């Protein structure tokens, strides 16, 4: 249907709508995660996300459209799962650091005596560097990095639901994971860390 030649100012008289009214009031919605906007006749409606923190367990979408929390038991299960995911994320970061330390560039210095001028003996030092881009440690680090990035974005999206229970699960899981896994870690700041 071509709407290019239509006069939209005359439409409001026939459709009962006044588009020039500045005092439009919308009826309050009952749940902060779902608010249907006006439909354009195609049956599709837009879901509004909350912009403030709320504590509820009904109709909470968790990452995927088919994963909806509607009961206190489902929220408790989601809390535990998100808590464990955040803990796993912290453990994965520490594990990657340990693997990186073990597989870092191995530099060996070999000293050999060589004859010098006037019959003196000099020590010549050779440096051998061993690290390749297509090595197993580097490929493993790459796969683990991809997993870490995906998990970090999942945790960010979970936090962005603004559901208080799920936000607490992310923060508590990350804190517990850090407490459990990084107590032996040297104080190093990772500037490439995602979502913190």
UniProtKB/Swiss-Prot annotation:
Residues marked Cleavage (site): 48-49
Classification lineage: Eukaryota, Metazoa, Chordata, Craniata, Vertebrata
Subunit field text: Homotrimer; is stabilized by cisplatin via interactions between cisplatin and the Met motif, and could be crucial for the copper(2+) reduction process and copper(1+) stabilization. Heterotrimer between SLC31A1, CCS and SOD1; this heterotrimer is copper(1+)-mediated and its maintenance is regulated through SOD1 activation. Interacts with KDR; this interaction is induced upon VEGFA stimulation leading to SLC31A1 and KDR subsequent co-internalization to early endosomes, thereby activating KDR downstream signaling in endothelial cells.
Family membership noted in the UniProt record: Belongs to the copper transporter (Ctr) (TC 1.A.56) family. SLC31A subfamily.
One MF annotation (Gene Ontology) recorded for this entry: copper ion transmembrane transporter activity
Ranges that cross the membrane: 75-95, 139-159, 163-183
Residue span of motif Bis-His motif: 13-14
Tissue/organ expression: Expressed in the tubules in the inner cortex and inner medulla of the kidney, the villi of the small intestine, the choroid plexus of the brain, the stroma of the ovary, the seminiferous tubules of the testes, and the sclera of the eye. Expressed in intestinal epithelial cells, with an increase expression from the crypt to the tip of the villus. Mainly expressed in both proximal and distal tubular cells in kidneys.
Keywords attached to this entry: Cell membrane, Copper, Copper transport, Disulfide bond, Endosome, Glycoprotein, Ion transport, Membrane, Oxidation, Phosphoprotein, Transmembrane, Transmembrane helix, Transport
Protein name: High affinity copper uptake protein 1
Catalysed reactions, semicolon-separated: Cu(+)(out) = Cu(+)(in); Ag(+)(out) = Ag(+)(in)
